[in-house]
């Protein structure tokens, strides 16, 4: 696999070529994903749940994200790596810059932050300092205590309008990609069409530019349960390599996610 850059993601959006992405946390799995030509890997604070066994992502530290980013980069030298900024590591623009610098030095190509218009100045500052930003809207796991659980977002017209406005504001501020999580497929389609940056969905329908799933979910090894929007590809194929390839192929062909995986 050739080295993937933000230019590739932009080109895929322009020509309408769908792409898959997946979470990873260690070199061994990252190597398998690279061998199957997985173009984008997300080193997520979801490691708090699937690696550390905690009920939320809130306790994950920047040092842990740095460690896992280094591990993933060692296993996948060519994938485009997006690393999460964990809870309260970007509460001010200055704090975000310090945290992001650590992830970029560890091998990330882009950092991801959860939040809407309050992050405008942070996105501007990071972008001006050569740190590419992936915004994250919809269900934001770091805000679980605000929601009272992991719930579908953007259900009302007011919520949908605000989310679209936030997406456009973050794009204007310099965000170069966007993740939409657990929102109605119709809203995700509208946001994807109205933005010029790549939009990656998880539980956001079939019309986003890319898809992402947690690796533990597609391999059927999640500690708790597999979300409605995911699928156990390993059970269908019998090997990790075949499961990953099937996931990549079905995203490209737009056969996954199917209607039953959407809201």
Swiss-Prot record:
Cofactor info, note text: Binds 1 Mg(2+) ion per subunit.
InterPro entries: Pantoate_hydroxy_MeTrfase, Pyrv/PenolPyrv_kinase-like_dom, Pyrv_kinase-like_dom_sf
Positions with a binding annotation for Mg(2+): 45, 84, 114
GO biological process, one term: pantothenate biosynthetic process
Enzyme class: transferase
Binding site for 3-methyl-2-oxobutanoate: 45-46, 84, 112
Keyword Repressor: no
Superkingdom: Bacteria
EC number(s) recorded for this UniProt protein: 2.1.2.11
Catalyzed reactions: 3-methyl-2-oxobutanoate + (6R)-5,10-methylene-5,6,7,8-tetrahydrofolate + H2O = 2-dehydropantoate + (6S)-5,6,7,8-tetrahydrofolate
Cofactor(s) of this protein: Mg(2+)
Main localization, broad class: cytoplasm
Pathway the protein acts in: Cofactor biosynthesis; (R)-pantothenate biosynthesis; (R)-pantoate from 3-methyl-2-oxobutanoate: step 1/2
Molecular functions per Gene Ontology: 3-methyl-2-oxobutanoate hydroxymethyltransferase activity; magnesium ion binding
Gene Ontology, cellular component aspect: cytoplasm
Keywords assigned by UniProt, alphabetized: Cytoplasm, Magnesium, Metal-binding, Pantothenate biosynthesis, Transferase
Location(s), subcellular: Cytoplasm
Quaternary data: Homodecamer; pentamer of dimers.
Family: Belongs to the PanB family.
Function: Catalyzes the reversible reaction in which hydroxymethyl group from 5,10-methylenetetrahydrofolate is transferred onto alpha-ketoisovalerate to form ketopantoate.
Protein name (record): 3-methyl-2-oxobutanoate hydroxymethyltransferase 2
């Amino acid at each position: 696999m050739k080295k993937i850059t933000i230019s590739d993601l932009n080109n895929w959006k322009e020509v309408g070529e769908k792409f898959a992405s997946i979470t990873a946390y260690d070199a061994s799995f990252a190597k398998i994903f690279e061998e199957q030509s997985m173009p984008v890997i997300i080193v997520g604070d979801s490691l708090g749940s699937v690696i550390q066994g905690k009920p939320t992502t809130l306790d994950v530290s920047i040092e842990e994200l740095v460690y896992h980013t280094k591990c993933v980069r060692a296993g996948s030298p060519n994938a485009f790596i997006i690393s999460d900024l964990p809870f309260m590591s970007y509460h001010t623009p200055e704090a975000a810059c310090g945290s992001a610098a650590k992830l970029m030095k560890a091998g990330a190509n882009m950092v991801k932050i959860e939040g809407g218009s309050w992050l405008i100045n942070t996105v501007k500052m990071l972008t001006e300092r050569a740190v590419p930003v992936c915004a994250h809207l919809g269900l934001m796991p770091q805000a679980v205590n605000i929601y009272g659980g992991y719930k579908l977002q953007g259900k009302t017209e007011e919520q949908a309008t605000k989310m679209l406005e936030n997406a456009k504001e973050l794009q204007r501020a310099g965000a170069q990609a966007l993740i939409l999580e657990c929102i109605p497929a119709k809203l995700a389609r509208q946001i994807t069409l109205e933005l010029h940056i790549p939009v990656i969905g998880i539980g956001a329908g079939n019309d986003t530019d890319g898809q992402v799933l947690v690796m533990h979910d597609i391999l059927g090894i999640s500690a708790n349960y597999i979300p409605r929007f995911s699928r156990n590809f390993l059970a269908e194929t019998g090997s990790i390599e075949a499961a990953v390839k099937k996931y990549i192929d079905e995203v490209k062909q737009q056969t996954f996610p199917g209607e039953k995986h959407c809201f």
